[in-house]
Amino acid sequence: DFGDEAHLELDPQIGYTAPVTLGSIHPTADIGMLRYNYVGNSDLNYNEYYFKMIFNALLHQSDSLIPSISYTNNYGGKVTSESMGKDISNWYFNVLYATPISQSDFGANASLGYSKASEEIYGSEAEDHFFDWKIGVTYAYKPMGLLAELAAMGSNLTTGGLSDTNKKGVKTAAVFTLTKSF
């Protein structure tokens, strides 16, 4: 729940990629920063730093496997820091598999993630960790550099006692995402 003021999340990202040689495997390393921005309530904003390894062509020519790790020392921004009386750090581990569907602009993906916070801040029965998952279908509109995704996403967080608004952020739901690449 982003409160009454923030109804949109925009997350710009900046990073650097470089090829890496691991014996006969040639993944790409990606390191960078993501800025979580909640339009209308900047007190929720925070930075997250990440590292990914992108392994392409594992099962066939166009698939990819992307394990990643992310860290923030200020999860939830100023709002969380003030409500907890201190900054909350969070580690996030994820593995994503993506593959095209035939020789089209459609694709499929699946991911499994694990979050671990420095305090018990997640779910209705305050926990310091949880798992999340996603299964999605994508469409790449290459002339404009757009990627549309429709995914089912969920977590193992408990929702008993949460408001309907707060449940939306953690229970299984359909999520549409539109990404623009430059």
Residue ranges and their predicted role:
Residues 1, 18, 33-39, 55-57, ...:
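Transmembrane beta-strands of outer-membrane beta-barrel pores
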Residues 1-5, 38-42, 77-86, 120-126, ...:
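Outer-membrane beta-barrel domain signature
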Residues 2-4, 19-28, 41-43, 57-64, ...:
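Short loop/turn motifs that connect adjacent beta-strands in outer-membrane beta-barrel proteins
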Residues 6-10, 27, 43-49, 87-93, ...:
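Residues that define the transmembrane beta-barrel architecture of outer-membrane proteins
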Residues 10-54:
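Hydrophobic alpha-helical segments and helix pairs
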Residues 12, 27-32, 49, 63-69, ...:
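Transmembrane beta-strands of outer-membrane beta-barrel proteins
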Residues 46-124:
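Detector for outer-membrane/organellar transmembrane beta-barrel domains
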Residues 135, 139-141, 168-182:
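Outer-membrane beta-barrel "beta-signal"
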